[in-house]
């Protein structure tokens, strides 16, 4: 949909139920008929629900390419990469704006964090040198994911914990300065009572769920840095979604400009981070330039 909005004249061919075994033929059919020059203007967008399958498809597609036949590949499985990038960037933005600093050294709790958005956010937070707690009702699932991310990053920054009960969820947030609710749509993960009684160190809380009941009680979907508890500032799903849409557009545009390359969560986050840091800088400059007699 976004690609059509950005490039209404583009020819888009859709392949459904693609398996890893299908990839080679699809890539070759895209590369060869138009020659090396035409290949530069042919892009592949990998969607999908299961991140393992998405990564397997990406790996196979990349192996099919060789000079001068190389295509740009965009990867955003059901919007998970751009959503996670926007969520992490927004929490960074308000951590800085509210005077709590960058993500480095922070403890982050990602509630219901084993889904596509949660695990992508965990990778991004860990890459920013934060300590990450991933919760799941299934302890083994959380631990397995944490181990996999640590192995990828060659660092011990992520841990998985069980959070099947309200008390377990609350305890998972006790040390967190930032909390991200990454659960399924229409599911409340964190009550205001848990946030108040357990997450006493929390300064920024974000929610990716825009369908009532929302993931965090008391955090409205359109909240954009609203103080929901003393010194705890909330970011709702619509505020995250607005940045997500901007990131997706820029990701697609970037891939169309470049003749080759992989445009994944790392590139998406770089775009999101740059966007919020530039906005933060502009807001600080505007505040500094405001005459003192205008201030309350």
Question: Where are the model-predicted features located?
Answer:
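N-terminal ligand-binding/catalytic initiation module
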Residues: 1-69, 268-289, 293-296
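Flexible, charged surface loops at secondary-structure boundaries
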Residues: 32-41, 67, 126, 171-175, ...
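Glycine/charged-rich beta-loop-alpha catalytic/anionic-binding loops adjacent to active sites
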Residues: 66-74, 104, 229-231
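A glycine-rich, Thr/Ser-enriched phosphate-binding loop motif common to dinucleotide/cofactor-binding enzymes
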Residues: 75-93
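Short glycine/serine/threonine-rich phosphate/pyrophosphate-binding segments
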Residues: 84, 115-121, 142-143, 187-190, ...
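Glycine-rich phosphate/diphosphate-binding loop of Rossmann-like nucleotide-binding domains
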Residues: 94-178
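Rossmann-like adenosine-cofactor binding region
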Residues: 156-234
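Adenosine-phosphate binding glycine-rich loop
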Residues: 211-296
């Amino acid at each position: 949909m976004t690609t059509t909005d950005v490039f209404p004249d583009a020819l888009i061919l859709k392949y459904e139920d693609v398996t890893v075994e299908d990839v080679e033929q699809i890539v070759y059919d895209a590369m060869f008929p138009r020659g090396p020059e035409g290949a530069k203007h042919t892009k592949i967008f990998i969607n999908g629900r299961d991140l393992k399958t998405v990564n397997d498809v990406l790996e196979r597609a990349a192996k099919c390419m060789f000079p001068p036949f190389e295509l740009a590949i965009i990867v955003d499985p059901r919007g998970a990469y751009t959503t996670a990038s926007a969520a992490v960037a927004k929490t960074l933005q308000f951590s800085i704006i509210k005077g709590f600093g960058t993500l480095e050294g922070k403890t982050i709790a990602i509630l219901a964090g084993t889904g596509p958005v949660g695990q992508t956010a965990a990778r991004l937070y860990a890459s920013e040198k934060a300590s990450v707690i991933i919760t799941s009702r299934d302890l083994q699932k959380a631990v397995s994911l944490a181990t996999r991310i640590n192995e990828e990053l060659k660092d011990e920054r992520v841990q998985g914990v069980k959070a099947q009960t309200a008390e377990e969820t609350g305890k998972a947030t006790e040390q967190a300065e930032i909390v991200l609710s990454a659960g399924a749509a229409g599911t409340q993960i964190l009550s205001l009572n848990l946030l108040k009684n357990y997450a006493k160190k929390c300064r920024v809380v974000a929610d990716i769920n825009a369908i009532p009941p929302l993931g965090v009680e008391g955090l409205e979907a359109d909240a954009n840095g609203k103080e929901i508890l003393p010194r705890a500032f909330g970011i709702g799903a619509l505020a995250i979604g607005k940045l997500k849409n901007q990131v997706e557009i820029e990701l697609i545009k970037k891939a169309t400009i470049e003749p080759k390359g992989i445009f994944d969560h790392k590139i998406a986050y770089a775009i999101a981070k740059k966007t919020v840091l530039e906005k933060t800088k502009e807001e600080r400059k505007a505040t500094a330039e405001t005459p003192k007699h205008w201030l309350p």
